[in-house]
Every structure is written in C-alpha cells, then in structure tokens.
C-alpha cells in the first residue's frame, strides 16, 4: 500500500529550503494555489476552466529541474490530483526503438509506469528527429494520446535547453495546446553554488 500523502505545508517548507530558484519557487507556489482552487471547485461540483498541469522546464543541466519535477509529483499527490505521486524519468532512448511500431510499445510501457504520477522527459527536443527513419514522432503521437486518455492521472513535464524546447513545442500543434506552462531555471549564482557545495 502507498504511504499517506504528505501535507502540502511540509512540501512548501521543503521548497523553501532549496537554494536559489527564486522565480521557480514563486511559480510553484502559484501553481499550488491554482490547483487547490481547481480541486475544491471540482469537489463542489462547480465548473472549472480547463487547467493544464503539464509543464515545460527550460534551463541548463544542473539547475534543479529534476529535483523540482520530483517535488511536483509529491505536491500533486498531496493535493489529491495524482493518485501515486511517483516520478518516472526518461530521455529519447527510453521512448524510441529502432523499428516501425516498436516505439509506440516502448513509449506506452513507460507511460504505464508513470500513471498516477509524473513522466519527466529530459532533453525532449531530441524526439524531433531528422529524416524518414526517425521514430521520435511516433513517441510524440503516443504521448499525446496518453495525455488525452489519462488526463486525470498523468502529468508530463518536458525539459531541456531554452530555445530548443520552444522550437520543439511549437513544432507540433498537439504539443503546443497541451504544454502552455513554462518554468525557466536560471543558472545558480556563484554564491548559491558555494552554498550548495
């Protein structure tokens, strides 16, 4: 059996202890407030605006993206939005296979593991392959369908460098319509680096 969900106050305190990430912390707190209102309205049977929980994390490697993705999974579980709150982390090689039809199967298996939690795809722009023999598009199509079919119990966070991520999202209307929440992770300052290490 799953351990009971953590208290949202405890998770907010944990977020506060992270070094740097000023803008990210503000955004996460906003998101917690919005998600709380969304959940309350849902419980009261009131109509809700369409509220997408999927996110794009942009920034250089080593800026805290995976750490925040893991925390988001726990936050969404705490708020009753996700049933399990686990994080499944993959990159292109975890989704794409070498032959026609295999990529959809491989991607579906990963999605199955992520149901109830967050699927975190690092360097997601690498799915935008070049040439006819690339199966990245098959992975994207499978992912988009799963985001629709499991909209109540799956959150997808895609991450990578700034410009490349924006290009990736805008390359596909399906991605564009589902990912409209961006969180930018700045590089740590010298002082912050000293605090971390």
Where are these regions (language model features)?
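A short helix-turn-beta junction within AAA+ P-loop NTPase domains corresponding to the substrate/partner-engaging
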Residues: 170-187
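Substrate-engagement module of ASCE P-loop NTPases
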Residues: 111-113, 139-154
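Structural recognition of the conserved hydrophobic beta-strand(s) that form the central parallel beta-sheet
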Residues: 120-122, 141-142, 154-161
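Conserved small helical "lid"/interfacial subdomain of P-loop NTPases
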Residues: 185-197
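Pre-Walker A (pre-P-loop) alpha-helix and adjacent loop at the N terminus of AAA/AAA+ ATPase modules
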Residues: 10-53, 74
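Conserved ATPase-coupling elements of RecA-like P-loop NTPase cores
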Residues: 99-103, 125-140, 151, 167-169
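Short glycine-rich substrate-engagement loop in P-loop NTPases that contacts/grips substrate
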Residues: 83-114, 137
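Walker A/P-loop
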Residues: 4, 46-85, 109-113, 179
């Amino acid at each position: 059996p799953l351990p009971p969900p953590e208290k949202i106050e405890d998770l907010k305190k944990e977020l506060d202890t992270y070094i740097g990430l000023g803008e990210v912390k503000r955004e996460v707190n906003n998101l917690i407030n919005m998600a709380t209102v969304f959940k309350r309205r849902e419980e009261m049977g009131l109509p809700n605006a369409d509220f997408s929980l999927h996110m794009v994390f942009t920034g250089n490697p080593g800026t805290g993206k995976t750490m925040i993705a893991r925390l988001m999974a726990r936050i969404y579980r705490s708020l009753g939005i996700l049933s399990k709150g686990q994080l499944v982390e993959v990159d292109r090689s975890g989704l794409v296979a070498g032959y026609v039809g295999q990529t959809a199967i491989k991607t579906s298996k990963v999605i199955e593991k992520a149901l109830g939690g967050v699927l975190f795809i690092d360097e997601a722009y690498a799915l935008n392959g070049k040439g006819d023999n690339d199966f990245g598009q098959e992975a994207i199509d499978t992912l988009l369908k799963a985001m629709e079919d499991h909209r109540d119990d799956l959150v997808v966070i895609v991450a990578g460098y700034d410009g490349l991520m924006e290009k990736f999202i805008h390359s596909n209307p399906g991605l564009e319509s589902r990912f409209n929440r961006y969180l930018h992770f700045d590089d740590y300052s010298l002082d912050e680096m000293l605090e971390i290490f």
